[in-house]
Amino acid sequence: MPKRSIHAVTAAAALACLAAFGTTPISASSAAAQAAEPRPAAPRFVPGACPKPPEPIEALRKARCGFLEVPENRSRSGGRTIKLAVAVIPAAAEKPSEDPVVFMAGGPGADTFDDIPFLMDSGLNKDRELIVMAQRGNLYDRPNLSCPEVDRFNAQAVGLGYDSQRAEQLMLKAVKDCRGRLTAAGVDLSAYNTTENAADFADLRKALDIPRWNVYGYSYGSNLALTYLRLHPEGIRAVAIDSVTPPQVTTLPWGWGSAAEGIHNIFKACAAQPACKDRYPDLPRLLTEQVRELEAHPLTLNATPSSGGKPVKVVLDGGALLNLIVALTPRPKDIPAALDELSRGNPKRFARARAAGSVQNVGAFAHGLTNSIACGEWAPGHSESDVLKAGRKAFPGWPDTVLAQAPQLPFQYPACGIWNVPDRAKVQRVATVSSVPVLVVSGTFDVKTGASWAKGVARNLSRSTAVQVPGIGHWVVPQSPCAQRVLASFFARPTAPDTSCVNGLEPEPFTITPK
C-alpha cells in the first residue's frame, strides 16, 4: 500500500496505537470544551472545510466536507450538541450508482479519516460515492475524546513488563487523568456508546437526504453496522461486514478464543506447506515454550522501532510476546521464523515490533470512546476471573500472569472502575435478525476477531453471504484483491455476489530462514 502500512491501520483498529483539526491544531482540552453548544432543533449537516491531517489525503481534495450536528445524549432533553466530521468523496465513475456507501471504522476510537487511502485503494468509491464520518468522540470531532495521557503511557509501557504492577499503576493514573479532564470539560461519557453511534449514522442519512445507501464496516465497525441494521433498518440497501465482532457475544473474555483460533490457523497453514512444516515442525509447542520462558525470565534490551529512529529500552515478556502476535507484528508469514529465531537467542523481530509502540501519534486515538464502549458494553456481566478462565481454555498450560489480561486490553476491569459508565450489556448484546442482504467477510489468520464467528452471525441474516479468505488477517478487504472483487460484486448485486475468486486461494508461502 502506498505511504501507509496496512499493519499501522489494523493496529489502530485493535487499539494498539493511533493531529490537528481543520487548519489549526486543537488541544484535547479545548476540543472537549467545544462541545458546550446549544442543542439543535433537529440533527443537521453543516458544510465546512475538510480535515487536514499531517499526511495529506488526496481524496479529501475533491470531497464535500462538514459536520453532522447531533445531541450528545438523545435520552436527555436540553442537552448539548456535538459535531461529527463528515466527508463525502465523489465516485470515480462518470455515471455512478445512486446509492452511496457509508463506512464504519474499527476501534472503537481509531482515526476514521486515516482509513480513507485504504478504502480508495480497495475501490470503495469506484462506482458510488463514499461517505466517511468520524464516530462520536473521534479525531476531528467536537469534542474529541482523545487521551494523550494514555498515549504517553503506551509509549512508556514498552520498557515495562506487560502485566507488571508498575505498568498497571501508570495506566490507571493515565485513565484517571483523562477521565477527569474530559468530565471537567462537560463531556457526558455515558453518551459515547454504540446505540448513540448507530443513531448518528441514521441521522446522517436523513441530513444528507439520501433515500438508500449501503454500509461497510470492519472490526468494531461491524458491531456498529449490525447494531445500526437492527435499530435503524430503514434506508439500508445492503450491509458488508469485515472481521466481525458480533454484538451478542463481544465481551472481554471473548478475545481469548479469537486469539487462539487465529494462531491455530496460522500454525495449521504452516504445517500444510512442506517447506514450513520441515523447518518449523512443532509451532504450538515452540510458542508455549517461549511464552513460559519469557514470562519467567523477561528480556530487557535496546531495540530500534520497526519504523526507524533511535533505539529504546524494551521489555519482552510472555504477555508482550502474545500481544505482538495478536497485533500481527510481525506479519503472519514471518511469525514462525520470528519464533524460531527467538528460541535461538535472536529476539530482534519481536523486540523491534515492541519498540514500535514507543512511537505514538499523541492525541489521535480516542481512548475515551474505547473506554466508554469497553466498560459499558464489553466488561459487564463478567469479571477478571472470567478473563483468566477463558485464557486457560484457549492456551492450557500458559502462565496465569499472561492469561489474566484480555488480549490488547490489559487492566481493563480496574480501568472500568475508574471510567464509571452505566452497564449497557442488556441493550447491546442482542443478535441482529434481518432480511437485508449482508456480506460477511473474514480472514483465516485474524487473531483479533476469529473467522469462525462469521457463521453464527450469518445464521440470523436470511439473505447473507459468508466468505472466508485464506491467509488474511484482520481487516480483510484492503489486503485481498479477491475480497475487493467480492465486495464490489456484492454492492452491484447484493443477493447474488460473485465469490468464485475465493475458490482455490491459499496462504502465501511462509518465510523460511536458514537452519
Q: What do the predicted segments below correspond to?
A:
Residues 447-452:
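Conserved alpha/beta-hydrolase "acid-adjacent" motif
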Residues 183-187, 195-212:
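Conserved acidic catalytic loop of the alpha/beta-hydrolase fold
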Residues 146-158, 225-290, 323-327, 333, ...:
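A catalytic-pocket lid/entrance helix-loop region that shapes and gates access to the active site
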Residues 470-476:
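Histidine-bearing beta->alpha loop at or near hydrolase active sites
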Residues 2-13, 27-169, 206, 284-290, ...:
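Catalytic-loop region of hydrolases
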Residues 215-217, 239:
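Conserved alpha/beta-hydrolase fold motif
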Residues 288-436, 479, 513:
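Alpha/beta-hydrolase fold active-site neighborhood
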Residues 111, 199, 217-229:
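Glycine-rich nucleophile elbow surrounding the catalytic serine of serine-hydrolase chemistry
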